[in-house]
Structures are given as C-alpha cells and as structure tokens.
Amino acid sequence: MAGKLWTFLLLFGFSWVWPASAHRKLLVLLLDGFRSDYISEDALASLPGFREIVNRGVKVDYLTPDFPSLSYPNYYTLMTGRHCEVHQMIGNYMWDPRTNKSFDIGVNRDSLMPLWWNGSEPLWITLMKARRKVYMYYWPGCEVEILGVRPTYCLEYKNVPTDINFANAVSDALDSLKSGRADLAAIYHERIDVEGHHYGPSSPQRKDALKAVDTVLKYMTQWIQERGLQNDLNVILFSDHGMTDIFWMDKVIELSKYISLDDLQQVKDQGPVVSLWPVPEKHSEIYHKLRTVEHMTVYEKEAIPNRFYYKKGKFVSPLTLVADEGWFIAESREALPFWMNSTGKREGWQHGWHGYDNELMDMRGIFLAFGPDFKSNFRAAPIRSVDVYNIMCNVVGITPLPNNGSWSRVVCMLKSQTSSSPSIPPNSCALVLILLLYFV
C-alpha cells in the first residue's frame, strides 16, 4: 500500500516545503563510466586536480546507480531523483509496441519524441520554469523539448567530445555563470567511458583519459578563482555508473543457440540486460527454453525483483534477460557491438561494459562536490543516484519535485544543516492523513 500512496503523490504533484539554501550558481559535471575506485586514496596521489577537489570539498565512498546500470536510465535518475520505473527511461534502447517507435541510445530521430522524455521533469526544466537560465554542454537530452520547455543554451552532442572540447566547455560555462547568462551549467564528458569500453577499466588508455580530465579539473579550480566565483559557485561532479571487464572469447551467450529469433517481435539491446518481446503464442516456450541457460536469468515482467525498481516501467518488455557479471548476451557472435579500431573497420573487441546488477562493486560511480555550501575535506558514506537530485535542488535554492531520494544520506555534506531538511506544511499533513486512511 505504501507504494500505491507514493505513486499517488507523484501523479498529483505532491511536494514538500523545502527551506532552500541561499541561491547560488551551480556547475555540474557528468563523467560517464567513472568507476568509484578510479579515485581511490592511492589513485589520488597521482591526480592533483581531483586531489585538490577532494581536499576542498566532499567525497562519498561510492554512488550506487539505478538499475539497469546503463547511461540513459541514470542520466534521468540523477536529474529527477526518481527510479527508472517512475521516470520511464528504462534503457539505452527501448521499444513502444503501441506506436512501434524505438529509442536507440538517442541517435535515431524517434529518440527525440516526448514519448520517452515526458515521464518526469528533470532539474533543468524545473529551473527554466522558474525563470532561471541553464547552459548545457553535450548533455544527452538537452536538445529535446521536454514538457514543452528547452534549456537556455544547448551545445548538442554529435560525436564523442574531445579533451579540448571538455576544457572549452568548462571555460565557457564558467564565463556564462560569471556573466549571469547562466544559473546552472551542466557538462557531459564521455571519454573515460569510451576507453573503458574499448580497452577495459584497468587499461592504460582509460587511465590516460582520466589524467586528461584531471588536468582540466586542475585548471578549472584556477579559473574559478580568476573569475572571482569561489564564494558564489558550487561544483558537483558525478558519474552514471562504473565499468567491469568482459571477455568475448568465452563469456558470450548467443540467443540463437537456444531459441528461434523468428519467434520474437522485437529485441532491444545486448550485453548485461536484454529486452525481448516474443510473439504472444511463443512466450511460454521461449521463457522455458531460456530458463535453462547458464550465466543469465530470465524474468517475466512481474517477477523482476522489486529491489531493481524497474518492472513498473511502461516500456519494460514481457521478458527481461539479466546476465551474470562479465557475461554478454547477444543474438549471435556476429552481432556483437564491435568498434572501429585502427584498421578503420568495425572489428575491435570491447573489453569493458556496464549495465549489470546495480549493487555490484564494479557498477559503483562517484560523487564529489565543493563550494561555499559544502564542507571541506569531508568523506561521506555511500549514496545512491536518486539522492543527487535533492542536493542539487538545495544548493540552487529550488523546491524539489517528489522523488525517491533520501535527504538523510546527503544532508551531512552541507555546512549548514539546520534549515535545509524537508518539512510538511500543516495543510499537507491533513492531506497525508486522508491519503493514509484511504490507501492503508
């Protein structure tokens, strides 16, 4: 019954009264595929940019992503504070059988349809509605009109941003924040994720990508001082998920060996989580055949574990396959997502992946923050991706929409904790009582 009550509150726009902090500017950096141990205490010794940020601000032990530990679901979880089954962005690849439209990791035209994005209101849209100004750089979805609104400025993602692109975005964002053109600036950077996929999370290439980011961050702290923003700007860095090693030589599950692909209406994605829409009369047969396959679990929709906060999503398929860590599900070996390596052909093997059970250690991400509202040299306990939204709302001084995050997990990061916790006004207390009587 508690779940029904929460759904009711979300649907009808119930929100808490939020005594917000002073309205300061915010710079957000989303570093894709950044695993928590990339900035372990030992690693920080050779990362002066990150080390300075950690010494000046807050570092959590790790951030647990939402399930599935994929990019688009967590992009939206981070910016809404809601689980995937609430905001509806449940995968990098989705299909809507009612309209026969597909979302293919944001690259196809149909991915821009409101169908996929209007399930929840992300922070940048809330700020725009409040007449705040938002600048976004390479951020997936900033080019989309969501609930009839777009950000003030969107530098659209076209190709993987280079290290120079990232540095230029940081510099331009700081200029925009200093001049008053922006109240929030948000920057997405992907290279750590790309190198982790291609070469593996422990590879020299991934480590080089991290060092390049570290160099930009070292300059960023200098640029903040040069622009006189140190007393008026909070900076938050986080990742969407981690990365683990995969081995295509001997850890691939080929669906074509167990079922006829002609018995499927649709297949979406490959890797740790695969969505299947069987021809209706073949559903039971396919389910029972796949139940015997080792190193993966097949779930009918209602049997998906509640802890994933996934199965109530409207785009969730009748059958969901979840691989064991390090295993990769594909229709066949020929259909594996090879990448274009130095040969100029798509024949490069992937050596890292994510999307697995979100509680696995290798799926953990990062959260760092510094600025006038955050404590200095503070280590915080682990948080979850749903928690990030509340802390962002607080430091920009805006009331958060109803969400799944825990304020108690993040309030410890702030210098001032006495006036920042959510409270319920008297008239809302009466509403809660009525709802409890109705639902319980």
From Swiss-Prot:
Zn(2+) 1 binds at residues 32, 71, 240-241. It holds the Pfam family Phosphodiest. Coiled coil: none annotated. One of its GO terms (biological process) is lipid metabolic process. Residues 1-22 form the signal peptide. This is Glycerophosphocholine cholinephosphodiesterase ENPP6. It is a lipid-anchor; GPI-anchor. The lineage of its organism: Eukaryota, Metazoa, Chordata, Craniata, Vertebrata. The modification Phosphoserine is found at residue 71. It comes from the Eukaryota. Homodimer; disulfide-linked. Homotetramer. Zn(2+) 2 binds at residues 193, 197, 354. Substrate binds at residues 32, 71, 92, 193, 241, 354. Its EC number is 3.1.4.-, 3.1.4.38. Belongs to the nucleotide pyrophosphatase/phosphodiesterase family. The keyword Glycoprotein applies. GO terms for cellular component: extracellular region; plasma membrane; side of membrane. It catalyses: sn-glycerol 3-phosphocholine + H2O = phosphocholine + glycerol + H(+); a 1-acyl-sn-glycero-3-phosphocholine + H2O = a 1-acyl-sn-glycerol + phosphocholine + H(+); a 1-O-alkyl-sn-glycero-3-phosphocholine + H2O = a 1-O-alkyl-sn-glycerol + phosphocholine + H(+); 1-dodecanoyl-sn-glycero-3-phosphocholine + H2O = 1-dodecanoyl-sn-glycerol + phosphocholine + H(+). Its cofactor is Zn(2+). Residues 420-440 form a propeptide. The gene is Enpp6. Disulfide bonds join 142-154. A lipid is attached at residue 419 (GPI-anchor amidated serine). Inhibited by EDTA and EGTA in vitro. The keyword Transport does not apply.
